[in-house]
Each structure stands twice: as C-alpha cells, then as structure tokens.
C-alpha cells in the first residue's frame, strides 16, 4: 500500500479541468455527481445509470458510449488525453489496471476505487461555503462513514448563514475598527453568541441584527 503519510488534503480549483471517469455504474455515478458542478467531466461506458443519463442530458457531464472491454489502447488514450484526473471505476479489475497504466504513462493523476491511487477523494460535506473532506486513506471506510454522520449532526445548515454573516461583518469592521486584533475579537464574540445562532432560526436578518448589536456595544465601550 502507498505510504499514507505522503497524502495532504488540498482544495483545488477544477474550473475547466478535464476529469475522465471510466464506468457508468453506481461508483462512476457517485464520482460524476461530485465533479459535475466544478469540472469538465467526461464519463465513458457502454451503458449508463439513469442518474448519469440525466446528468448527460442536462449537460452537466459528457457521456461517451464505448465498449471499454473491446476498446483499443489508442481509443483509451484518446479519452484520457488532456485529462487532469482519471478515475477507473469499471467492474473489471484488469481493465481498471490497464486504464491506470495508460494514465501513469502520461503523468496524469489517478483516483483508484479499489486501492490508493495518486489522489484520494474524500467523503465531502458541504454547508454553503463550508466544505469538509473526510478520509481514512482507505484504511477504514466504516470509520469515515461514522465520522461523516457525527459531523453532519454537529454542522447544521446555520453554519452556512454564519459564514455569510461573518464575511459581511469582516467588511464592515475593516471600515470601523483599525486594529486587526480587535476585529478578530469582535468576530469571535459574534461567533460564540448563542443569541446570534438562535436568530438564524427566525431569519438571517434577525441574526444579523443581533450581531450588529454586539458590535455597537463593543464600539461604545471602547469609546469609538
């Protein structure tokens, strides 16, 4: 197994990057759903799941119908050409290995579904602009799934609203508070305020109103 201490989590801008997924089943479908909104995603297979067909029809992914078992090396290379990442996700081990070998020859990143490749795709939780990736680097999918369930219970949809509010407050404070240390202190007061968090259950505006009240109180006490 690849040394897992060499892996580092990164957030990548995949705009315009070509992602090639081989396999139109459940695994390929899951990978395609992950990449469809942020990359030029191509899925190659003889048959496609219903969800993949819908993604193709809507233009979110490109579908290439091809019998991969009988496809020539040149056909596979043609699909892989220019790719940023290749994902061999067929049900045929030998075919996956063949695709992997071709990608490696061309120094293309690989996410292998049955072992560690050069790229590990984590389980992803999104709450607006908050993105959390979870991975055990292949050692325990069960622990990864359990961790995801725990975090999903903790990170509520209100986190997305708080990110929006904090971004708004940062801009406001830069105009009214010169010291970065003080701005940070105020933002933390808002972040740790139960009244602000509870305000989101009513509306974003209610939470924002309470946050600005905290800021006003701070500025008054600081004689600003």
Swiss-Prot record:
InterPro entries: Met8-like, NAD(P)-bd_dom_sf, SirC_C, Sirohaem_synthase_N
Main EC class the enzyme belongs to: oxidoreductase
Catalytic activity: precorrin-2 + NAD(+) = sirohydrochlorin + NADH + 2 H(+)
Annotated transmembrane regions: none
MF term (GO), any: ferrochelatase activity
Alphabetically ordered keywords of this record: NAD, Oxidoreductase, Porphyrin biosynthesis
Pathway(s) annotated for this protein in UniProt: Porphyrin-containing compound metabolism; siroheme biosynthesis; sirohydrochlorin from precorrin-2: step 1/1
Binding residues annotated for NAD(+), in chain numbering: 26-27, 47-50
Gene3D superfamilies: NAD(P)-binding Rossmann-like Domain, SirC, precorrin-2 dehydrogenase, C-terminal helical domain-like
Source species, domain of life: Archaea
GO biological process: siroheme biosynthetic process
Assigned EC number: 1.3.1.76
Short name of one Pfam family: NAD_binding_7
Family to which this protein belongs: Belongs to the precorrin-2 dehydrogenase / sirohydrochlorin ferrochelatase family.
Subunit structure, as described in the record: Homodimer.
Primary role: Involved in the archaeal biosynthesis of heme. Catalyzes the oxiation of precorrin-2 into sirohydroclorin.
Record protein name field: Precorrin-2 dehydrogenase
């Amino acid at each position: 197994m690849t040394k897992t201490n060499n892996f580092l989590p990164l957030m990548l801008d995949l705009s315009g990057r070509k992602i090639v997924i081989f396999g139109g089943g459940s695994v390929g479908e899951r990978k395609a759903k992950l990449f469809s909104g942020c990359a030029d995603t191509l899925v190659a297979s003889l048959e496609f799941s219903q969800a993949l067909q819908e993604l193709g029809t809507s233009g979110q992914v490109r579908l290439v119908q091809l019998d991969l078992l009988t496809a020539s090396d040149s056909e596979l290379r043609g699909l892989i050409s220019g790719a940023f990442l290749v994902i061999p996700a067929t049900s045929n081990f030998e075919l996956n290995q063949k695709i992997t070998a071709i990608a490696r020859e061309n120094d293309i990143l690989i996410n292998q579904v049955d072992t560690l490749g050069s790229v590990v795709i984590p389980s992803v939780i999104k709450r607006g602009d908050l993105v959390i990736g979870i991975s055990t680097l292949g050692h325990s999918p069960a622990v990864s799934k359990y961790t995801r369930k725990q975090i999903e219970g903790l990170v509520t949809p209100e986190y997305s609203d708080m990110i929006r509010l904090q971004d708004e407050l940062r801009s406001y404070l830069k105009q009214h508070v010169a010291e970065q240390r003080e701005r940070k202190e105020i933002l933390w007061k808002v972040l740790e305020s139960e009244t602000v968090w509870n305000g989101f259950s009513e509306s974003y505006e209610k939470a924002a109103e309470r946050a600005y009240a905290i800021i006003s109180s701070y500025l008054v006490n600081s004689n600003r």
